[in-house]
Amino acid sequence: MSRFWSPFVKDLVPYVPGEQPKLARLVKLNTNENPYGPSPKALEAMRGELNDNLRLYPDPNGDRLKQAVAEYYGVTPAQVFVGNGSDEVLAHIFHGLFQHDAPLLFPDISYSFYPVYCGLYGIAFEQVALDEQFQIRIEDYKKPNAGIIFPNPNAPTGCLMPLQVVEQLLQANRDSVVVVDEAYIDFGGETAISLVDRYDNLLVTQTLSKSRSLAGLRVGLAVGHPDLIEALERIKNSFNSYPLDRAAIVGAAVAFEDREYFEDTCRKVIDSREVLVGQLQAKGFEVLPSAANFIFARHPQQDAGELAARLREQGVIVRHFKQPRIAQFLRITIGTPEMNQALLDALS
């Protein structure tokens, strides 16, 4: 702490990102990165941007990427916002859409950046308990609120809310912005983007870090009514008018256009997930139903924190959360078959 810090900074409780170890030979299953590389076509497109044009600023609107997203989802570019990772997109949403008199609502078990954003922007919030199956109860959200946000599939549980239930939540909150954070939707869910033309209060966020293997590039997006998108553009242009560099815009656009590679990669992750679930269950683990590129598991005879530490000693890193309701679970990223086997060998 410095004497130059403002009281505001002193009171901040920052987000703690997943560990990015520098040690070699570690099996890294802790931050939900895709074990397969980006689209070769996307890599080639990005290499093509490494030329003298880097002296020029990139397109502040990211129109090339917006067009690719719009074509992929059957919406218009005016319904698309792009930013420097979905975390930045979410930050603009919190800043621009959730500062009202009533509290923001989100699940008690969800993305741990949500309360951090609330602290940063002075947003009152209420964490609503998930049920015993780690699902949202629609009735719990029928109360005055400044907005609603939740990850679907849930992070860190991986549990999916079916699209018809998402629509029920929208119908129950016509006068509030409902944000569906779909970082993991491509691994087994149905996107709510299909609903944006029917609900002007719906905003869907996604990232290219997971299913499109571009975590190191930092590209995120939001899709919703043009009025909501305009609000995000106003925030963006009051903060950083050039959030995406030239290579990121082109590479992300091509990643959307290369559907064959994307679908093949997702299928490999899903297939590996289902195999690993069965293998862990055979070892006595309880594994929650997952529609993500990770699983959430616990063993009735093993303390999760101790197990994570012992796995690390064997060169395998997984994620352990100390939150009371989930303190006995481990979040395990789906790796390649070889990475998953290393996990099983370490457990043995």
From Swiss-Prot:
The keyword Translocase does not apply. Belongs to the class-II pyridoxal-phosphate-dependent aminotransferase family. Histidinol-phosphate aminotransferase subfamily. The lineage of its organism: Bacteria, Pseudomonadati, Pseudomonadota, Gammaproteobacteria, Pseudomonadales. Coiled coil: none annotated. Its cofactor is pyridoxal 5'-phosphate. It comes from the Bacteria. This is Histidinol-phosphate aminotransferase. It is an enzyme of class 2 (transferase). InterPro entries: Aminotrans_II_pyridoxalP_BS, Aminotransferase_I/II_large, HisP_aminotrans, HistidinolP_aminotransfase, PyrdxlP-dep_Trfase, PyrdxlP-dep_Trfase_major, PyrdxlP-dep_Trfase_small. It comes from Pseudomonas putida (strain ATCC 700007 / DSM 6899 / JCM 31910 / BCRC 17059 / LMG 24140 / F1). Pathway: Amino-acid biosynthesis; L-histidine biosynthesis; L-histidine from 5-phospho-alpha-D-ribose 1-diphosphate: step 7/9. GO terms for molecular function: histidinol-phosphate transaminase activity; pyridoxal phosphate binding. One of its GO terms (biological process) is L-histidine biosynthetic process. The keyword Amino-acid biosynthesis applies. Homodimer. The modification N6-(pyridoxal phosphate)lysine is found at residue 210. PANTHER family: HISTIDINOL-PHOSPHATE AMINOTRANSFERASE (PTHR43643:SF3), HISTIDINOL-PHOSPHATE AMINOTRANSFERASE 2 (PTHR43643). Keywords: Amino-acid biosynthesis, Aminotransferase, Histidine biosynthesis, Pyridoxal phosphate, Transferase. It catalyses: L-histidinol phosphate + 2-oxoglutarate = 3-(imidazol-4-yl)-2-oxopropyl phosphate + L-glutamate. Its EC number is 2.6.1.9. It holds the Pfam family Aminotran_1_2. HAMAP family: HisC_aminotrans_2 (MF_01023).
